[in-house]
C-alpha cells in the first residue's frame, strides 16, 4: 500500500495511478489520492473541525471552498455531532471516520484504505462499511484487508496477492467459477433413487448427485441428503424442485452452496504455491 501511495519506492515493477507513474511523479499522484493507513496518526490535541481545516489547507483546497467541503464530509461521515470534540477523546470508530473524512476531503478520484475495519466492534464495522459503500460512484476505493468477509460484502472486484504476485482477480462470482469450476446444491429428497436421478437428468444431464454424510439404507419414502454438482453457473434450484415434484418425489429442502471468499483465497494461494514448487529446481543428489 505504501508503494501504491508513493511513500515507499518499489525495488522492481511499476505502478501507475490515474495514468501517472508513481515512481517518477509521486507528488502529482498524491494530489489524486486519499489515503487511510492502518494506523492513522491523528493529532490527539486537535478538534475534529480544526484538523480537517488544517488538512484541507495542506491539500491546497481554497479557503472559499474548504468550509462548505468540511460541512459536507462531516455529513457524509456522520461526524457533525463531534465536530468540536478533541480527537484524542473519541472512540476508535469515530477516529476511523475522521480518517475517512480527511481522505475524501479534497475529492480525490482514488481512495486507498488499509484495513479500514480492523479493531472495530460489530456496530462500528457496519457504520464504516455503509460509509465506504456510500462512496461508490463518487470515487474509486481500493481496500487492502485480511478480513475477507468484509471484502466480499464491500468490494465489486477482488485481487488476491501471494508473495507479491497477483494469483487471481475478478468479481467474487468470477473467482468462485475460476477456482472451483462448478456449482453445488444441498438437497433433501424422498423418492426412488433411480427416479430422482432421472428427474435431475432432465434439468442438466451433467448434474451429479452424491450422498451427504452417513446416509443409512432407506426406502423411497425416507428423506436422503444429497450434494448436487454441475458446471453450470446459472441458478437451477427452482428447476430441480419442479422436476422432482413432477416425478412424484418430495423435496424437504434445497440450498445452493456458495464457497466463501476465504475458501477462494485459500484455494488460490495454495494453487500458486503448488505452481512455484512444480517449477522450482530440484537439488542434485549427492554422490
PLM segments and residue spans:
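ABC transporter nucleotide-binding domain
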Residues: 129-231
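Non-catalytic alpha-helical coupling and interface elements of nucleotide-dependent molecular machines
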Residues: 57-60, 180, 184, 205, ...
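ABC transporter nucleotide-binding domains
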Residues: 1-163, 167-168
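Short glycine-rich hinge loops at helix-strand junctions in the catalytic core
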Residues: 78, 204, 248
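Short, surface-exposed acidic/glycine-rich loop or hinge patches that mediate macromolecular interfaces
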Residues: 20-23, 84, 166, 190, ...
Amino acid at each position: 500500500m505504501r508503494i501504491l501511495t508513493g511513500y515507499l519506492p518499489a525495488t522492481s515493477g511499476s505502478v501507475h495511478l490515474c495514468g501517472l507513474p508513481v515512481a517518477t511523479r509521486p507528488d502529482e499522484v498524491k494530489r489524486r489520492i486519499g489515503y487511510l493507513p492502518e494506523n492513522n496518526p491523528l493529532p490527539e490535541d486537535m478538534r475534529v473541525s480544526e484538523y480537517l481545516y488544517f488538512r484541507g489547507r495542506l491539500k491546497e483546497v481554497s479557503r472559499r471552498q474548504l468550509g462548505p467541503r468540511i460541512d459536507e464530509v462531516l455529513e457524509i461521515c456522520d461526524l457533525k455531532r463531534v465536530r468540536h470534540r478533541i480527537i484524542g477523546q473519541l472512540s476508535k470508530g469515530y477516529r476511523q471516520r475522521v480518517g475517512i473524512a480527511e481522505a475524501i476531503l479534497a475529492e480525490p478520484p482514488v481512495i486507498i484504505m488499509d484495513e479500514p475495519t480492523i479493531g472495530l466492534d460489530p456496530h462500528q464495522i457496519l457504520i464504516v462499511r455503509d460509509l465506504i459503500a456510500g462512496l461508490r460512484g463518487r470515487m474509486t476505493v481500493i481496500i487492502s484487508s485480511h478480513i475477507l468477509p468484509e471484502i466480499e460484502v464491500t468490494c465489486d472486484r477482488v485481487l488476491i496477492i501471494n508473495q507479491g504476485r497477483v494469483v487471481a482477480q475478478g468479481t467474487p462470482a468470477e473467482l468462485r467459477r475460476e477456482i472451483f469450476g462448478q456449482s453445488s446444491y444441498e438437497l433433501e429428497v424422498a423418492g426412488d433413487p433411480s427416479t430422482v436421478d432421472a428427474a435431475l437428468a432432465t434439468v442438466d444431464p451433467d448434474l451429479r448427485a452424491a450422498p451427504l454424510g452417513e446416509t443409512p439404507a432407506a426406502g423411497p419414502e425416507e428423506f436422503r441428503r444429497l450434494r448436487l454438482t454441475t458446471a453450470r453457473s446459472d441458478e437451477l434450484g427452482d428447476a430441480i424442485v419442479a422436476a422432482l415434484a413432477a416425478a412424484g418425489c418430495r423435496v424437504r429442502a434445497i440450498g445452493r452452496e456458495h464457497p466463501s471468499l476465504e475458501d477462494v483465497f485459500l484455494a488460490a494461494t495454495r494453487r500458486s504455491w503448488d505452481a512455484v514448487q512444480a517449477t522450482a529446481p530440484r537439488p542434485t543428489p549427492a554422490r
